[in-house]
């Protein structure tokens, strides 16, 4: 097993909304290249995921001095023959970390199981898109 670690710092405009002193943050700032729903309308064969992989992403957010955490999304995980997904949030001091992990075990999704695959991908996307809520102190 070889690892590739990439660290990047960036700011993204529009990642949150301020409404009546409450900030709703979108922390899922990226899209997975390999995890998309499969169109089954004309498909006659099994689906092959591009590659086996383990993808780990940490998104760190600094909480502004005059704000505090109102709520963090509950942990999410699912384990299947194809993929393991895990997404957690943690807070230490004025920093929140969203930890996402995706491990692709088996690349082949049988045609008959593609609807189940699509549901797993949809649920994963919804879990990753849950918002962090901050409020004024």
What are these regions (language model features)?
Residues 1-137:
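A sensor for short, sequence-defined functional sites
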């Amino acid at each position: 097993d070889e690892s590739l670690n990439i660290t990047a710092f960036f700011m993204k405009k529009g990642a949150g909304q301020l409404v009546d002193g409450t900030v709703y943050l979108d922390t899922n700032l990226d899209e997975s290249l390999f995890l998309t729903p499969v169109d089954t309308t004309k498909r006659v064969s099994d689906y092959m995921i591009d590659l086996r992989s383990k993808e780990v992403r940490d998104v760190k957010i600094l909480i502004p001095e005059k704000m505090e955490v109102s709520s963090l999304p509950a942990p999410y995980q699912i384990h299947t023959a194809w993929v393991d997904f895990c997404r957690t949030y943690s807070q230490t001091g004025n920093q929140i970390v969203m930890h996402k992990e995706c491990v692709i075990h088996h690349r082949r999704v049988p045609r008959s199981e593609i609807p189940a695959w699509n549901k797993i991908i949809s649920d994963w996307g919804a879990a990753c898109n849950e918002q962090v809520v901050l409020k004024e102190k």
